[in-house]
Swiss-Prot record:
Both the O-glycan-rich domain of the extracellular domain and the C-terminus PDZ-binding motif (DTHL) in the cytoplasmic tail harbor an apical sorting signal. The cytoplasmic domain is necessary for the apical membrane targeting and renal tubulogenesis. The cytoplasmic C-terminus PDZ-binding motif (DTHL) is essential for interaction with NHERF1 and for targeting NHERF1 to the apical cell membrane. The extracellular domain is necessary for microvillus formation. The large highly anionic extracellular domain allows to maintain open filtration pathways between neighboring podocyte foot processes. It is found in: Apical cell membrane; Cell projection, Lamellipodium; Cell projection, Filopodium; Cell projection, Ruffle. Glycans are attached at N33, N43, N104, N144, N360. InterPro entries: CD34/Podocalyxin, PODXL. Belongs to the podocalyxin family. N- and O-linked glycosylated. Sialoglycoprotein. Keywords: Cell adhesion, Cell membrane, Cell projection, Glycoprotein, Membrane, Phosphoprotein, Signal, Transmembrane, Transmembrane helix. Involved in the regulation of both adhesion and cell morphology and cancer progression. Functions as an anti-adhesive molecule that maintains an open filtration pathway between neighboring foot processes in the podocyte by charge repulsion. Acts as a pro-adhesive molecule, enhancing the adherence of cells to immobilized ligands, increasing the rate of migration and cell-cell contacts in an integrin-dependent manner. Induces the formation of apical actin-dependent microvilli. Monomer; when associated with the membrane raft. Oligomer; when integrated in the apical membrane. Interacts (via the C-terminal PDZ-binding motif DTHL) with NHERF1 (via the PDZ domains); the interaction is not detected in glomerular epithelium cells, take place early in the secretory pathway and is necessary for its apical membrane sorting. Found in a complex with EZR, PODXL and NHERF2. Associates with the actin cytoskeleton through complex formation with EZR and NHERF2. It holds the Pfam family CD34_antigen. It comes from Homo sapiens. The chain crosses the membrane at residues 462-482. This is Podocalyxin. Residues 125-142, 313-324 have a biased composition (Low complexity).
Amino acid sequence: MRCALALSALLLLLSTPPLLPSSPSPSPSPSQNATQTTTDSSNKTAPTPASSVTIMATDTAQQSTVPTSKANEILASVKATTLGVSSDSPGTTTLAQQVSGPVNTTVARGGGSGNPTTTIESPKSTKSADTTTVATSTATAKPNTTSSQNGAEDTTNSGGKSSHSVTTDLTSTKAEHLTTPHPTSPLSPRQPTSTHPVATPTSSGHDHLMKISSSSSTVAIPGYTFTSPGMTTTLLETVFHHVSQAGLELLTSGDLPTLASQSAGITASSVISQRTQQTSSQMPASSTAPSSQETVQPTSPATALRTPTLPETMSSSPTAASTTHRYPKTPSPTVAHESNWAKCEDLETQTQSEKQLVLNLTGNTLCAGGASDEKLISLICRAVKATFNPAQDKCGIRLASVPGSQTVVVKEITIHTKLPAKDVYERLKDKWDELKEAGVSDMKLGDQGPPEEAEDRFSMPLIITIVCMASFLLLVAALYGCCHQRLSQRKDQQRLTEELQTVENGYHDNPTLEVMETSSEMQEKKVVSLNGELGDSWIVPLDNLTKDDLDEEEDTHL
């Protein structure tokens, strides 16, 4: 698309018949009268509303015929103007609260030296002592070629007196700005700037009108229109930067949104950038336009500084643009130490019956801040909660300072605890029954569920099985013991029975023992045992018999 536009512009340049150069004349020519706009534009133009800024630029230059070899070298250099800022004290820029009158910016090309001159005139009448004075600064540039109405080619060496002037009328709106300190750097009337080539668009000598309002910005040019809503900045200077042979890039120092083209068939593409593009090789010095959130700063030859955004609220309307400042109320002093903080408040009237905790400090109060205050706050928080953990606990203390003394009243101590989800789950797990009564039906933490589902399903049957087996083992042991005792008793009884049968049959090993026949004379004798018990058995040990019995037995036997 851009290549097609460049080719069409080149064909237009080649198809134009060459015109003879006009001789320089000290008197103003009709082309000069047509192209020159007087600086007293405020008398000829209708008064503009306070919310709008109108820039009128008249340009009636026609195509200039140059050889084909120089078609790609149509250049014009623009010198960046330097804004001088005067203030009451160094390093401070004070913007006017209300400025009335137009600000005239005249760009005059030609003259005795043949160099274009840029002049900025500041308004004389102000309504406030705190004003920003824009010093008049003149910068000259040596153009390669200039164009006039009749299409003749004028060079810088011709020394012609024909002028090509552009008058810009600016009306600033009523606005109140804060005083912002800025570092100042020495300014010189002329600073070395690098020239920027500008490609001259093909035009038929129409008047160009560019109008910028506060609520909606409109750039009106015959053939195409650009619209940008919500523009509140004042356009002081426009810098044209060469992009290609048939392309123009419109750069402004304020923050302007990119404008979209609404018509087709134009030979020059215009782009509005959001900030001034600056490089160290092409533009060592730049000019800054004041906007609603920026203040004018003196620029040094190497850098262009931008002021930080002022703490204010912008309110724009279709009729007037106003700036409203919000000054925050003075907050109560708060001392913050990592996660702990102490807030001081005014002492309120309390009833006599209410008891207050009063701390009389020897050093600085808790409202002043310091290392001792951090230690004191930590001690108070640990006293309130024994398990105070700074990693997950935040302690806040509300104090009331007594004016004229170092006494503070402790009104409230708050400790916020941030527990991990796992700790909360473990604590709620122990109170699951109460949670169910309160209306909680389920609780999950990842794969873990309520305590009932987390328990072992086989725990109760296992316990029952173990108890049953233990009882069975005890029963088996009891039966074994009973059976073993019975068997032993039976064996003893069988042995005694066999002995009795042997003795009764006369088969015994002791020859002295002999079974005597029972007679009426012989009575059963009861032998006293060794332990003093009477013996019921007929079988009596031989040792228990007396000597007399033994003699009688022997005699009887014989």
